[in-house]
Amino acid sequence: MTKIIQISDTHIVPEGALAYGQVDTAAALAETVATINRLLPQIGPVDLVIVTGDLTEHGTPEEYDRFKMLMADLDLPYRVLPGNHDRREPMRESFADAQWMPRTGPLDWQIDFEDFAVVGLDSLTESAAHGTLEPATLSFLTDALSGLGDKPAIVGFHHPPFAVGIRAMDAQNLHDADSLGTALSLHSGQVRLVCGHLHRSIAGLFSGSLCQVCPGTSHAVTLDQRANAGNSLTKEPGGMLLHEWRDDGFLTHLIPVGAFPGPYPFLGVS
């Protein structure tokens, strides 16, 4: 049974700094890694961790080095995708020793497992907050899905392809979603879309497939759907998603970050 864990929006800043003057994102990522390692005996084996963008706050080499240092304690392999806070070339350089990191062009990749493949797409628009899929990325996706036949696929990228009612964030979603839908429609197998960016657990249908948005590891985008709402964060607990193939379909679990009391046996249950 193939399983992957998704984390997103770690927003690592330089040592001694707080993201937005409020959030210790490094401590949150360290706790996320510890949570994953602690849960592995209960949920394993897990094949991969994917990070769906915004690894850093400013996309600097220093921040990528700090991200990698914090992830070094993870007991699983991981792959990353860029978000709007990342910068493509510093990110490429930071992961230059990884065989899966493209040497040129968009930061797209694919990995095949027994039950499904994972296709990672680069939705970064340099110098803008919204997402786009370059023609090279759309071609990469089309070729990847064509090569899979009817094998299921998880397709990961940073920017959600639909609006969620948080107006400031909806303006920053994936702007060429129709092109993505066209590429997905050509695949005969099951597809699960996984994104980040919104720092909340949100699920919706897109092009006939379930799209699951991952919460951030350290803070949430405030759930405020009023027309005049600004863009703000709320210090809600961090979370992650466990995606697995079970029987004949994808299943996703929401896992909070942290250590909690328990487990306690249910009274009267043998």
Name each model feature, range by range.
Residues 13-15, 57-62, 84-92, 126-129, ...:
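Active-site environment of divalent metal-dependent phosphoester hydrolases
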Residues 6-8, 47-54, 78-84, 122, ...:
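Active-site neighborhood of phospho(di)ester-bond hydrolases with catalytic His/Asp-centered motifs
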Residues 32-48, 130-210, 242, 250-251, ...:
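His/acidic metal-ligating clusters that form di-metal
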